[in-house]
Amino acid sequence: MAKKVVAIIKLAIAAGKANPAPPIGPALGQHGVNIMMFCKEYNAKTSDQAGLVVPVEISVYEDRSFTFILKTPPASVLIKKAAGIEKGSGEPNAVQVGQITKAQLQEIAQTKMPDLNANDIEAAMNIVAGTARNMGVAVVD
């Protein structure tokens, strides 16, 4: 018989930097999960993505065991990395803070494809381009 899920916890954690301190500790602790075990497994699985924020969806079962699914990093994080900027524009329509090429846009869309609600790469590129525009990052040829 399948184990009963008692909670689904969604967190966005820096890759390879999970530790029992807030926000991870309290979120998992209230469901009785072994926090150190989660941190070790998460850090091991995300060690190759250093510098990125990797969202994770943790399913906690009634026997206090857990499984987790790693999502793709947020488009905004990937865009900031590609453009080489610290943060997006405060006034995206007035102030441009950086630019990315179509090739970089396609690479980001390819990375985000599993988590986007898009049927093909063109639609995914449009979604990512919209995110870039809202951050004050121009897409150039």
Curated annotation (Swiss-Prot):
PROSITE patterns: RIBOSOMAL_L11
One Pfam family this sequence matches: Ribosomal_L11_N
Molecular functions per Gene Ontology: large ribosomal subunit rRNA binding; structural constituent of ribosome
UniProt xrefs under CDD domains: Ribosomal_L11
Changes after translation: One or more lysine residues are methylated.
GO terms under cellular component: cytosolic large ribosomal subunit
InterPro entries: Ribosomal_uL11 (IPR000911), Ribosomal_uL11_bac-typ (IPR006519), Ribosomal_uL11_C (IPR020783), Ribosomal_uL11_C_sf (IPR036769), Ribosomal_uL11_CS (IPR020785), Ribosomal_uL11_N (IPR020784), Ribosomal_uL11_N_sf (IPR036796)
Entry's Gene Ontology BP terms: translation
UniProt keyword list: Methylation, Ribonucleoprotein, Ribosomal protein, RNA-binding, rRNA-binding
Domain of life: Bacteria
Keyword RNA-binding (UniProt): yes
Record's function text: Forms part of the ribosomal stalk which helps the ribosome interact with GTP-bound translation factors.
Subunit structure: Part of the ribosomal stalk of the 50S ribosomal subunit. Interacts with L10 and the large rRNA to form the base of the stalk. L10 forms an elongated spine to which L12 dimers bind in a sequential fashion forming a multimeric L10(L12)X complex.
PANTHER family named in the record: 60S RIBOSOMAL PROTEIN L12, LARGE RIBOSOMAL SUBUNIT PROTEIN UL11M
Annotated family: Belongs to the universal ribosomal protein uL11 family.
Protein name: Large ribosomal subunit protein uL11
Gene (name only): rplK
